[in-house]
Amino acid sequence: MQTLVNKIWYQGHPLQWLLLPLSFVFGFITFVRRGLFQLGLKAQTILPVPVIVVGNITVGGSGKTPMVIYLIELLRAHGFNPGVISRGYGANIDGVKQVAYNASATDVGDEPAMIVARSGVPMVVGSKRVEAANVLIAEHGVDVIICDDGLQHYALGRDIELVVIDGQRRLGNEYLLPAGPLREGPWRLKDVDFVVINGGNADVGQFEMQLAPTQVKAVDGNIITTDFDKSQPLVAMAGIGNPTRFFDSLQAQGYQVVLSHGFDDHQAYDKKQLCDLAKDLPLMMTEKDAVKCRDFAQENWWYLAVNAKLSPQFDEQLLSRLHEVVAAKQGNSHGIR
């Protein structure tokens, strides 16, 4: 099913034309919904601290999680105490839940588990993002909220909007769901503060982001190595929005990938499934996949950690905008744009 969806959205499959009427319905619903917030007919909560929303206008992964981790480190380096909120996709969450270090991806979602394992940031997950943010403010004294994947969650007021776009897939066929991958039309990009292109060329006013490999680490956490033998044959797997990007990266770095297998984004794994895939060869995966495999990982299962890299100009503009928000926050209200 996922293969067919990708063909429709990214390869011009003729089924897209049959789905277009449903896309018009979806577009009308989203237009009306956003308009209700703009007109004040639906309530939007304004928080006492700045809110940075990191999202996209497409379905599927685009590199938001590395971007969130980058922002955490950037803000900390400049004296801020950030916290993160997220829906916790794929987890069964009643209300809101604080994400503990080494939390199970089953309990909190794979991306929150990865973010906290990497950064140790205070993080709360749940569908009620305003409630999650208030927990961070009350219990952790955070002075900036980063909302992971909340661009269309208009009940939460925001001060800075940042959209991450996959530099390979871009916006696909540029149709709204279900004929295309778009949650909102391309026009929405004109309203946001920052557009970041992950692994591709940026247009004027946009910023490029590259994912730079750092270390190969054991999934079970027992070994950290920087001298992994790239000459040995291995199997690669990825359950992310664009698995091909990961496989291409391994090939470009000289890894001897004899088999690659892409899973659906947020895929749940079991030991037998992955042992059958690897067949005693080393298994290389993404960091996001690794947090779901820690409990049953074999000693020759590895993941490649990556860091987001952006320009100093991005840092300067983001921090400048944030300082403006901080200065104006007292007594001001920031509505939806």
From Swiss-Prot:
Pathway: Glycolipid biosynthesis; lipid IV(A) biosynthesis; lipid IV(A) from (3R)-3-hydroxytetradecanoyl-[acyl-carrier-protein] and UDP-N-acetyl-alpha-D-glucosamine: step 6/6. This is Tetraacyldisaccharide 4'-kinase. It comes from Shewanella sp. (strain W3-18-1). GO terms for cellular component: plasma membrane. PANTHER family: TETRAACYLDISACCHARIDE 4'-KINASE (PTHR42724), TETRAACYLDISACCHARIDE 4'-KINASE, MITOCHONDRIAL-RELATED (PTHR42724:SF1). GO terms for biological process: lipid A biosynthetic process; lipopolysaccharide core region biosynthetic process. Keywords: ATP-binding, Kinase, Lipid A biosynthesis, Lipid biosynthesis, Lipid metabolism, Nucleotide-binding, Transferase. It is an enzyme of class 2 (transferase).
